[in-house]
């Protein structure tokens, strides 16, 4: 115990603001068009394993919810019309949070104290590992008045990870119904946000979380960084503005 106290005193405070830590150089974030004339070769569409790229004439759009940031499209584009950035602030609001009046009411009710119930409905655990980091001393989720709870009956926010499998469909529906209103649902990662990771049609999966329950916050990524998760939570609570 004495050695632990000595180490704590020597290291000092390690907790940082949600956006204070720099992203590593090798981090892969948002993929976006870089501009220029598309040759319509279709190489990027063929390279994308989740069908996140859509082409309309000469314009290319990337479905950020479905994108797993593998970078294959960037590598295959001979004209360099796609670029991969280090941007992780991809969270977007949906559902009831799109209405200003409803969002204001939810912010007043949950803005300073939010209890989260995590539900894995079929993930590879990568998103779950990132969630665990929120409870460590660096990101310290509790400094924002947010904490995880063991029961959906005590929760305000249902945080869903993984593509919804058929075997866990009932678990998702029952957990959602057990969460008291007003309640929010956050889809964490590309699997929960879009449900395309294992194909749009698959005998074992239902799709994304919004195929079964209304989703209010989407946090894309494969997996999303802890900062991306914090950005999504704080954005939903009205504590920060959309980047």
Predicted stretch roles:
Residues 1-49:
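Ferredoxin-type iron-sulfur electron-transfer modules and their immediate structural context
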Residues 131, 139, 145-228:
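Cofactor-cradling patches in redox/metallo enzymes
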Residues 229-236:
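Short amphipathic C-terminal alpha-helix that caps PH/PH-like domains
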């Amino acid at each position: 115990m004495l050695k632990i106290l000595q180490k704590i005193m020597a290291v000092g405070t390690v907790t940082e603001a949600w956006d204070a830590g720099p992203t590593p150089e090798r981090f892969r974030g948002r993929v976006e068009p870089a501009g220029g004339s598309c040759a319509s070769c279709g190489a990027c569409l063929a390279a994308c394993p989740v069908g996140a790229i859509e082409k309309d004439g000469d314009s290319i759009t990337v479905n950020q919810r479905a994108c797993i940031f593998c970078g294959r499209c960037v590598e295959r584009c001979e004209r360099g019309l796609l670029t991969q950035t280090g941007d992780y602030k991809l969270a977007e609001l949906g559902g009831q949070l799109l209405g200003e009046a409803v969002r204001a009411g939810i912010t007043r009710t949950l803005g300073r104290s939010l209890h989260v119930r995590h539900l894995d409905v079929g993930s590879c655990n990568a998103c779950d590992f990132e969630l665990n980091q929120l409870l460590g001393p660096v990101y310290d989720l509790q400094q924002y008045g947010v904490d995880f709870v063991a029961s959906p009956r005590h929760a305000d926010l249902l945080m869903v990870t993984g593509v919804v499998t058929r075997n866990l469909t009932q678990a998702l529906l029952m957990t959602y119904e057990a969460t008291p209103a007003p309640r929010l649902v956050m889809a964490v990662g590309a699997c929960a946000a879009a449900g395309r990771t294992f194909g749009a049609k698959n005998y074992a999966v239902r799709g994304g979380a919004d195929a079964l329950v209304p989703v209010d916050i989407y946090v894309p990524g494969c997996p999303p960084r802890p900062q991306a998760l914090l950005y999504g939570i704080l954005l939903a609570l009205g504590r920060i503005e959309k980047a």
